[in-house]
C-alpha cells in the first residue's frame, strides 16, 4: 500500500511505498529534504508531523526529547507514513543550503570505453552519505595523487552510489591512474559539493540541454533529477561529440526518448572550436528560445561560444546555466 506525503512549507508531495522510510521516498522522488547521516544518528532530518500517522521502522541513536515527541517530531530516515501525512520539514532549495562534507568511498565499478573514456562508479562507506544537488561537482582524492574535481553524473536521489565520466588526459596523474592502475574496491576520499549548475525546479519553461563530450555528466545528473521530479515540460538534449567518436551513452539517451513523451535527443558532430554553428542550429530548432531554460556544459570556449549565440537570440541571462569543465 502506498500513501502520499506532503512536505511543508514547500508543498512538495510524493508517494511512500510500504516499508520505505519517508526520507528514502523523498530522495527517490528527486526532492532534497534536510538530512545528514540517513541512519538515525545525527537528527538533522527531524521533522514535525502536522497531520496523518507515522511509525518508526528503524532504530535510531538520536534521542528525541519527550517535549518534541508530544509536538509530533520524528526522524524522516527512520519513520514511514501509515496514511496520507503532512510534515513540517526543511528542504535544500539552493546549492548554498548543502554543507561541505568529506567522506570515504571505494571503487564499485570501472568501465573503460576504448582508450580515452571511462565511467567510474563509487560507493560511499557504510553508514555515510554525500549530500549534493544534481549537476554539482565534487573532489576525488586517491592516495598519493593530486585531487581531481569532477561533476557527479548521477542524481542526488542516490547519495551512496555516485557515477563519474572521465576523458583521458596524459598530463593528469589522476586520469592516468584511472586508465592504468585503478581497480575495484580501491579506496578514495570524496569532498564537496561545489557548483551552482543545478536544475531550476520551480521553472515550468521548456528546457534545452547542450553538452560537449564528457561534460554530458552533469547534464545527465540534471536530466535524472527532472525525471524523478516528473517534470512535464519539453526537454531537448543536444550532445556534441568529436568526429568519429559516437556518444558513449547513446543507448541510454535513446532509452529516455523511448520512455518519455516530453524528451528528445539529438547528436551533433562538431569540433569544440566551432560550437557556435550547432548553437545556431539549436536556436533555429527553437525560435522561441527566449522562453526556454538552457543548460550548457563543456570546455570553456565551447560554453562561451554557445552561450553568446543563445543570448544573441534573445535568451535572458537568468535562463542560461553554464558548467565549464575544470582543468586538473
What name fits each language-model region?
Residues 93, 144-146, 192-197:
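Short, charged beta-turn/beta-strand-edge "cap" motif at the junction between a beta-strand
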Residues 15, 36, 80, 131, ...:
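Residue-level "contact hotspot" at macromolecular interaction interfaces
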Residues 99-187, 241-243, 270-271:
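Ferredoxin-reductase
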Residues 1-33:
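N-terminal pre-ligand scaffold of iron-sulfur
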Residues 25-34, 44-93:
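Iron-sulfur (Fe-S) cluster-binding segments and ferredoxin-like electron-carrier domains
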Residues 159-160, 166-328:
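FNR/FR-type flavoprotein reductase catalytic core
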Amino acid at each position: 500500500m502506498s500513501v502520499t506525503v506532503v512536505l511543508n512549507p514547500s508543498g512538495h508531495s510524493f508517494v511512500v511505498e510500504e516499508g520505505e522510510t519517508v526520507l528514502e521516498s523523498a530522495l527517490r522522488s528527486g526532492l532534497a529534504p534536510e538530512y545528514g547521516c540517513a541512519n538515525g544518528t545525527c537528527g538533522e532530518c527531524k521533522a514535525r508531523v502536522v497531520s496523518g500517522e507515522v511509525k518508526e521502522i528503524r532504530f535510531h541513536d538520536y534521542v528525541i526529547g519527550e517535549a518534541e515527541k508530544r509536538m509530533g517530531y520524528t526522524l524522516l530516515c527512520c519513520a514511514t507514513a501509515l496514511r496520507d501525512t503532512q510534515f513540517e520539514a526543511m528542504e535544500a532549495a539552493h546549492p548554498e543550503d548543502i554543507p561541505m562534507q568529506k567522506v570515504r568511498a571505494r571503487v564499485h565499478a570501472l568501465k573503460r570505453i576504448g582508450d580515452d573514456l571511462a565511467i567510474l562508479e563509487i560507493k560511499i562507506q557504510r553508514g555515510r552519505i554525500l549530500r549534493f544537488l544534481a549537476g554539482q561537482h565534487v573532489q576525488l582524492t586517491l592516495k598519493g595523487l593530486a585531487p581531481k574535481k569532477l561533476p557527479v553524473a548521477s542524481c542526488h536521489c542516490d547519495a551512496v552510489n555516485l557515477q563519474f565520466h572521465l576523458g583521458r588526459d596524459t598530463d593528469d596523474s589522476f586520469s592516468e591512474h584511472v586508465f592504468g592502475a585503478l581497480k575495484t574496491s580501491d579506496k578514495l576520499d570524496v569532498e564537496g559539493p561545489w557548483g551552482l549548475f543545478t536544475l531550476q525546479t520551480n521553472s515550468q519553461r521548456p528546457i534545452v540541454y547542450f553538452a560537449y563530450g564528457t561534460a554530458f555528466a552533469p547534464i545527465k545528473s540534471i536530466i535524472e533529477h527532472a525525471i524523478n521530479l516528473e517534470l512535464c515540460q519539453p526537454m531537448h538534449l543536444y550532445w556534441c561529440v568529436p568526429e568519429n567518436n559516437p556518444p558513449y551513452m547513446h543507448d541510454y539517451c535513446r532509452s529516455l526518448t523511448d520512455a518519455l513523451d516530453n524528451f528528445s535527443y539529438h547528436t551533433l558532430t562538431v569540433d569544440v572550436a566551432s560550437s557556435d554553428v550547432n548553437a545556431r542550429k539549436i536556436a533555429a530548432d527553437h525560435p522561441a528560445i527566449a522562453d526556454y531554460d538552457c543548460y550548457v556544459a563543456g570546455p570553456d570556449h565551447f560554453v562561451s561560444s554557445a552561450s553568446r549565440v543563445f543570448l544573441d537570440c534573445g535568451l535572458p541571462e537568468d535562463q542560461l546555466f553554464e558548467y565549464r569543465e575544470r582543468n586538473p
